[in-house]
Amino acid sequence: VMFEDRVDDFTARQQVYNLLNDADLPDGVTPEVQPLYGPTGEIFRYTLRSDKRSVRELKTIQDWVIERNLRSVSGVADIVSFGGEVKTFEVSVNPHQLINYGITSLELYDAIAKSNINVGGDVITKSSQAYVVRGIGLINDLDELRNIVVKNINGTPILVKNLADVHESCLPRLGQVGRMDENDVVQGIVVMRKGENPGEVIANLKDKIEELNQNVLPEDVRIIPFYDREDLVNLAVKTVTHNLIEGILL
């Protein structure tokens, strides 16, 4: 969707949101509006390196740890990831076990879906302080998934592992990223929000990456930057300054 230059960015986005909310879309389809950035918003690129971990593990770290931390940097609009394998937990249902226990596949699906959400509660007030109640329910590993209760039959809990085989897998790969002598890497691209100062954003990014490398990531995992727009920005500023001085002198 292209708007004229004089249209305010936030007004334009709100109009798009309103039209999307009124659109008649199939069940399960949730439209998204991209973050606010321009065609020259790409300012930083990096890869992940580890001598011990697979690209699937690195992709998981990228999606769940690095992306969330880099998005918190002021001026960053989005983090775009390429390469690696997206880890999934796969449930292979045994139809004979479903029949034996009298459980439908929909009941199994609902039990897993309801056990994989975070829920907000109320607030408990004690003395002069208020404590927020929150239920953490996201599944972290295979054992948690295997031990989800699907149904109680005569006081006996029927678990997912009684009905299906649960194992780790990945989504179908749509491509692969290579760099230098590595033919399969995980790459991240940082996109700057429209109107921000690229020099300040890049400096803050470098500070955050140093913090992640030293204090947050596993010892064998490192973020390796290989491109940033700082040199281009400095050269452009130097050129403009030089031309202005020449123009004044002439």
Task: State each model region's role.
Residues 1-248:
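Membrane-proximal extracytoplasmic
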